[in-house]
């Protein structure tokens, strides 16, 4: 199983920006923890970060046919990007949205979430540990999909 982790704008500044909200852990440290868990779980994982909406859309589209699932923190684009929402919907892959802070307890404009309705699940407010939870959740989602597909194969009429 292969998972793409897509990080949105300003996440490259983790550990520097607003530590009272996002903590002191750098993005590279989060990715190192995810890489370790992926290795223990037999997952292939790739990472992508961009501050540019179009590059994020391109990366989501590149995931089609290449990965089994997406973990995304669209950051500020969560609240504004119909393009990212449409890209997630278009590729139709299991997608888990992650936010380090609890966006529902922050500024009013952050309560608008454009992408959650097209994601399989959302994990918010657990700090960097949310990425670990997203990976555990993604493994569960992918295993359930695999089990359903295997059951459907067994139930399909045998060709004569």
Curated annotation (Swiss-Prot):
| Classification via PROSITE patterns | DEHYDROQUINASE_II (PS01029)
Keyword Amino-acid biosynthesis belongs to the record: yes
Record site feature (Transition state stabilizer), residues: 17
Which reactions fall under this protein's catalytic activity? 3-dehydroquinate = 3-dehydroshikimate + H2O
Q: In which pathway does it act?
A: Metabolic intermediate biosynthesis; chorismate biosynthesis; chorismate from D-erythrose 4-phosphate and phosphoenolpyruvate: step 3/7
GO molecular function terms listed in the Swiss-Prot or TrEMBL record: 3-dehydroquinate dehydratase activity
Q: So where's the catalytic machinery, residue-wise?
A: 22 (proton acceptor), 99 (proton donor)
Q: Where does substrate bind?
A: 73, 79, 86, 100-101, 110
Look up the EC number in the record and give it: 4.2.1.10
Keyword terms: Amino-acid biosynthesis, Aromatic amino acid biosynthesis, Lyase
Q: Which residues form a coiled coil?
A: none
GO BP terms: amino acid biosynthetic process; aromatic amino acid family biosynthetic process; chorismate biosynthetic process; quinate catabolic process
Q: Which Pfam families match?
A: DHquinase_II
- Provide the function of this protein: Catalyzes a trans-dehydration via an enolate intermediate.
Q: Into which family does the record put it? A: Belongs to the type-II 3-dehydroquinase family.
How it assembles, according to the record, is: Homododecamer.
What this protein is called in its record is 3-dehydroquinate dehydratase
């Amino acid at each position: 199983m292969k998972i793409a982790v897509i990080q949105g704008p300003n996440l490259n500044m983790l550990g520097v920006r607003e530590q009272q909200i996002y903590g002191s852990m750098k993005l590279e440290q989060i990715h190192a923890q995810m890489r370790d868990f992926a290795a223990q779980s037999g997952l292939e994982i790739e990472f992508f970060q961009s501050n540019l909406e179009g590059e994020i859309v391109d990366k989501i589209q590149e995931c089609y046919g290449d990965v089994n699932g997406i973990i995304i923190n669209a950051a500020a684009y969560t609240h504004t990007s119909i393009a990212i929402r449409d890209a997630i919907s278009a590729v139709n892959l299991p997608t888990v949205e992650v936010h380090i802070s609890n966006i529902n307890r922050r500024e009013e404009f952050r309560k608008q979430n454009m992408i959650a309705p097209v994601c399989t699940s959302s994990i918010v407010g657990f700090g960097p540990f949310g990425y670990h939870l997203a990976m555990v959740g993604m493994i569960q989602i992918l295993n359930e999909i695999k089990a359903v597909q295997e059951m459907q194969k067994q139930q399909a009429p045998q060709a004569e």
